[in-house]
Amino acid sequence: MAGRQQELPTITPYLQETSPERAPSLPPKKKLRKNVQVPDRVPVLPPSPEVVPDSEEEEEEVVYTGFSHPGVQVVQKASGKRYVRRLEPKGVPPPSEENNEEEEPSTSKAVTSVVLNPQAEPLVSAWEKGMDLMIKLMEKYHVEAEEKNGFKFLPEQSNVYRKICQTWLNEEHRGLPLTFTSHKTFVEMMGRFLRAYVESYAGVKNNEWEPTGCAIWLHGCTEQEGVLRCYHGLEMIQKEQLVEMDVASENAQRALKEHPSRAKVVQNRWGRSVVQLKNDDARCCVEDVSCATNVFSAKSCGLFFSEGTKAQTAFLQIEAFMQAEYPKMQNGLKRLLMVMRCDCLYKPTGVPQLGRQMCKATPFALSNVDSLRAEEVTDKVALASIQYPCVLVYQCANPVYRNSRGGQGPNCDFKISAPDLLGALQLVRRLWGENVDGPLPKMLIPEFKWSSRLQYRNVALPASHGDGEKEPF
């Protein structure tokens, strides 16, 4: 064993060449050419898209809809989360807005556009804003529960506003003095003005319905003495008028008392005693020159004054009354707030009625004003009526007087004077200030412009009376 030689490890030449102890040397680096540009950054290829099966869209349920402009919907998903979705008008593509709502991670590619609230406050629609105010007023002024629960800003729900104003008047203004105005009509006009303020405050105004039934008329009846203008904007024609009234009627007794020189009791062609009143200063529309008394042409505006001087005095009275009430007024001095629609015409259908399409304007004389001395009165508002002792009164478009036969058209007991109409607006503003914080909303009353739609109607349109049957015969 001692003489045996030590054995050397046997390794094949191939293994010796590839062994890590004897790794082959790297090839020499090549020098880059000067004209070769090396990119600063190697572009990274996008990862291969993963194939994800399409997931079914979550079921959505509309909780409620807000009647704003544009409208909104509160939608609840199957997971219980809610978001607000805006309803775009027809023909307008929806805006591309991202949904920032925190949701559970989902692989669905469906994107829902929502309305983002930059102020991080709950969205309140115009309908909700108006309903909050109306609920407050209805609870405070004791509106019945049935009407309160069914209130939805519909045009035919005007009685809610009237009841609010009536309760407020009973609590705050008992014994309200009125001049040739019925209390019912005064409350009606207060309700209309209150409705206009509520709709303006909330932003739920209907463009097809004017709630006040009023207009601002640039009348031009005080620019020149003896010159009156009708609703066409043209000068009214002076002609003679002969009126016969029953002796027992209210108008006949008033004519005998106020105009003893022009009114007399005579017998008509049938042998009955009547009061005959002759008016030499009557004024009519230019379209009614050839018409008899109380007869109007198809193109007439329906405006007629039996005494032109008395009518101009009434226009001067309301002008002086407004100037005394608003001494800093700039634009409204020559304009008149007038009622266009009485209870007969205050309907959202817009169907013309038989007769006049506007309220009848009549000048009424203030009695016992001659006994007052202007130097003894310091109130400028009262001085306007002392200086011009006539007021303009708006009545039903086709009024029916006591002891007289009614006409074919509809009629009501609407009656309010021009000063009391302005007073109704003032009291509504006071009611608003007592119940709503902040500035008074701007109420826009349209300016009067003559339209052929307002012409006198001698023939009524065929009307439907309703029928529940499917077939007429």
UniProtKB/Swiss-Prot annotation:
PTM sites of type Phosphotyrosine: Y141
Main location group: host cell
Gene3D superfamilies hit by this protein: Adenovirus DNA-binding, C-terminal domain superfamily/Adenovirus DNA-binding, zinc binding domain, Adenovirus DNA-binding, N-terminal domain
Coiled-coil stretches: none
Chain segments carrying region Disordered: 1-69, 85-111
Residues the entry annotates as binding Zn(2+) 2: C342, C344, C396, C412
Protein's name according to its UniProt entry: DNA-binding protein
Name of encoding gene: DBP
